[in-house]
UniProtKB/Swiss-Prot annotation:
This is Alanine racemase. Belongs to the alanine racemase family. Disulfide bonds: none annotated. The active site is at K33 (proton acceptor), Y267 (proton acceptor). It comes from the Bacteria. It catalyses: L-alanine = D-alanine. Keywords: Isomerase, Pyridoxal phosphate.
């Protein structure tokens, strides 16, 4: 057994997907980019399919290829616009892609003409930038771009989409901004439809929009963070508590030392023992995703009790003040975060992220590859 493990509670994933589906009639496209936010894309996708998930979203062609190699046959949408080098792989693996420029259409059309498969096709979703400022065509270019897709042999229009910038905020100006984005998007959709074009899937809602902006559900939703157990902080605590963390990060006590009063611990001498105490050495550090910004202040759970991490977190290790008298032994399990329903302390990754001045997305994605993923089915 690896000393550092990310326990993936698939029952919690299924529970969260059930909660998501109870809140919308739209299809669910589950984001599994960044290895399913650190949870393991292939195993997560297989579990999600049994819950009725319609499709999956990835950030790049390589992620889509891994899903196909694992036997996932459901629709996959690549959220990044394609490069010339990637298009042949998109076509080969039957991956739909976002486009936002005429040049993307030309690249795909050329690749289709050069394909050895004379019947090859490529599904595309036209992305409209309604205020995010990233990938997407201007709203006044959307209809012409869709018409060009429909007129190009081998290309199939699969959807039209956008992305919200501040759907997780309840500030009045941000609520207005989200509604402005939604209205601009709907104007584009209506204009396209009036031109005689049918759009199979209209989609925009991320996790925050799913919970807070029901008028933005449309035909399909893309809830990532919710599926993995975390709702935006702006959501009412009663709603947030319904979603259960899927990942539990655990390690073990590798060594225990007694240190005298006045002794320093770790780099830069950031912590000094005020009295004689015991410290435990944990074989986990920032290379594993336990960010340096978490100390001081991070608490870990050992045997149902909380202990503070002290001193600077190192690349491969960190130190815990175990106090006196000593109630911990070498080899004891240590939980850094995880769901309470799994018998853990109930300290979620959102608590750690807030302490580190970041967001749960970043903390979950940062859990390193040398942390073994163990799937609890």
């Amino acid at each position: 057994m690896a000393c550092n493990q990310a326990l993936i509670h698939l029952a919690n994933l299924r529970h969260n997907l059930g909660e998501i589906m109870s809140r919308t009639r739209a299809r669910v496209c589950l984001p599994v980019k960044a290895d399913a936010y650190g949870h393991g894309a292939c195993d997560v996708a297989q579990a999600a399919l049994s819950c009725g998930v319609h499709s999956f979203a990835v950030a790049c062609v390589q992620e889509a290829s891994q899903l196909r190699a694992a036997g996932v046959r459901a629709p996959i949408l690549c959220l990044s616009t394609p490069t010339a080098e990637e298009i042949s792989s998109l076509i080969e693996h039957r991956v739909h892609t976002v486009i936002s420029e005429r040049a993307h259409i030309a690249l795909i059309a050329r690749a289709l003409r050069q394909s050895a498969d004379t019947g090859a096709t490529c599904g595309v979703h036209v992305k409209i930038d309604t205020g995010m400022g990233r990938i997407g065509c201007a709203p006044d270019e959307a209809c012409a771009l869709v018409q060009m897709v429909c007129a190009t042999p081998g290309l199939h229009l699969e959807g039209v989409c956008t992305h919200f910038s501040v759907a997780d905020s309840v500030r009045a100006e941000d609520l207005q901004y989200t509604e402005m984005q939604r209205a601009h998007f709907m104007h584009c959709v209506q204009y396209i439809r009036k031109s005689g074009i049918s759009i199979p899937l209209v989609h925009a809602a991320n996790s925050a929009a799913l919970l807070c902006h029901p008028r933005a559900h449309f035909d399909m939703v893309r809830p990532g963070l919710l599926a993995y157990g975390y709702a935006p902080e702006s959501v009412h605590p009663a709603v947030r508590s319904v979603f259960l963390p899927v990942m539990e990060l655990v390690t073990q006590v590798r060594a225990i030392k007694k240190i005298p009063a006045g002794a320093y611990v770790s780099y830069q001498r950031l912590w000094r023992a005020h009295t004689e105490t015991h410290v435990g050495i944990l074989p986990i550090g920032y290379a594993d995703g336990v960010m340096r910004a978490l100390s001081p202040g991070l608490q870990v759970c050992i045997g149902g009790k909380w202990y503070p991490v002290v001193g600077a977190i190192c690349m491969d290790q960190c130190v815990v003040d175990l106090g006196t008298p000593l109630r911990v032994t070498v080899g004891d399990r240590v939980t850094l975060f995880g769901p309470q329903d799994a018998g853990g302390p109930g300290q979620g990754a959102d608590v750690l992220a807030s302490h580190a001045g970041t967001i749960p997305y970043e903390l979950l994605c940062a859990i390193g590859k040398r942390v073994e993923r163990v799937y609890i089915r």
